[in-house]
């Protein structure tokens, strides 16, 4: 209950007050709220793709292998035409990224909370260095590069919370809401060789690796 509340509240003092005054029922009452940043879940590392597959699915069942982009983690909240953008640390960067606000506003859903990354690409479609992406999101003034969003998870769509669904269910909702141009490249497989080949192709595109 504490971990869930910590993820959803976006505020440690709010969690502490709820725990002191209402105990577990008060913590359980925290839920997704449009416009309130959600603490992201962070991945752990593995030395090889094969080991990551085994860790994710010891029984050998298929798992999702996704491109890991070397950009800024970005959470997008859409409520009608109102869009807010939050970083990994829950800083509100809405005013700094008008091109991403426009992209999220264009989605054919009434409301959504999406998790993804944003990064800058060069003319050939390869990613710029992380520091270039970071500097392009750091201020409201003149920016050297525009950023492009890519999403890999949906936490809520059209008023429905998805956080208790398995990843496969959340991804189905994401695909229905987000056009392919804004989706992180992905492979579902139980084959270690296929996963390794996919990882090599992602690295060849200039990205950081894969997430399993």
Language model: regions and residue ranges:
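Metal-assisted phosphate- and nucleotidyl-transfer catalytic regions
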Residues: 177-212
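N-terminal nucleic-acid-engaging modules of covalent nucleotidyltransferase systems
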Residues: 1-150, 154-188
């Amino acid at each position: 209950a504490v971990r869930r509340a910590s993820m959803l509240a976006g505020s440690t003092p709010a969690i502490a007050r709820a725990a002191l005054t209402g105990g577990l029922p008060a913590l359980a009452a925290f839920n997704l709220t449009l416009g309130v940043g959600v603490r992201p879940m962070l991945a752990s590392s593995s030395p090889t793709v094969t080991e990551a597959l085994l860790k994710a699915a010891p029984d050998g069942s298929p798992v999702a292998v996704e491109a890991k982009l070397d950009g800024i983690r970005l959470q997008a909240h859409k409520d009608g035409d109102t869009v807010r953008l939050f970083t990994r640390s829950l800083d509100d960067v809405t005013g700094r990224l008008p091109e991403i606000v426009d992209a999220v506003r264009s989605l054919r859903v009434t409301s959504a909370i999406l998790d993804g990354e944003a990064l800058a690409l060069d003319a050939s479609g390869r990613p710029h260095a992380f520091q270039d992406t970071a500097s392009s999101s750091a201020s409201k003034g003149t920016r050297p590069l525009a950023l492009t969003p890519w999403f890999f998870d949906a936490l809520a769509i059209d008023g429905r919370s998805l956080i208790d669904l398995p990843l496969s269910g959340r991804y189905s909702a994401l695909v229905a809401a987000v056009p392919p141009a804004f989706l992180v490249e992905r492979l579902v497989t139980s084959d270690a060789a296929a996963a390794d080949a996919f990882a090599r192709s992602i690295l060849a595109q200039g990205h950081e690796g894969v997430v399993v």
